[in-house]
Amino acid sequence: MSTCNYSPKEKPVDVNNVSEKSAAVNNVPEKPAIVNNTSEKAVDVNNVSEKPVDVNNVSEKSAAVNNALEKPAGANNIPEKSAGRMTSSEWIAEYWKGIKRGNDVPCCCPRKMTSADEKFPVFCKGYLMRSMHKDD
């Protein structure tokens, strides 16, 4: 028979006693008040001498996220409308507007729009056609 040297500092909670259960739940210590404190100095993402973000400090995390750089200039500017409310035809129309402005094409065609692409209004058809002919 083994002996256990564990001696709890507090009386264990009887899980069958409802009043003890609620007392244990109500005595949980609260989180620190700094969670919603936004008065701390914001993290400057351009200053490399800035101290690193403490990932355990919620206010520093949110400051780093809120100070994140905008999208790069070449990125397609899809409106802020959520994807759930935007139909696929609306999304494709906005996508092609960005390409015609000379923005980079994401994913399968990372390049500028060419005159050959203007002849193929279907998504990336020009690029796919050219890539198939290269294999011949």
Swiss-Prot record:
Q: Does the keyword Chloroplast apply?
A: no
Please give the residue ranges the record annotates as the region Disordered.
66-86
| A biological-process GO annotation | symbiont-mediated suppression of host cytoplasmic pattern recognition receptor signaling pathway via inhibition of TBK1 activity
Task: Please name the InterPro entries in this protein's record.
Answer: ASFV_DP96R
Key words of the record: Host-virus interaction, Inhibition of host innate immune response by virus, Inhibition of host NF-kappa-B by virus, Inhibition of host TBK1 by virus, Inhibition of host TLR pathway by virus, Viral immunoevasion
Family membership noted in the UniProt record? Belongs to the asfivirus DP96R family.
Query: Which purpose does this protein serve, as stated in its record?
Result: Inhibits cGAS-STING-mediated type I IFN expression and NF-kB activation by inhibiting TBK1 and IKBKB/IKKB. Inhibits host TBK1 phosphorylation.
The protein's name is: TBK1 inhibitor DP96R
Q: Which organism is it from?
A: African swine fever virus (isolate Pig/Kenya/KEN-50/1950)
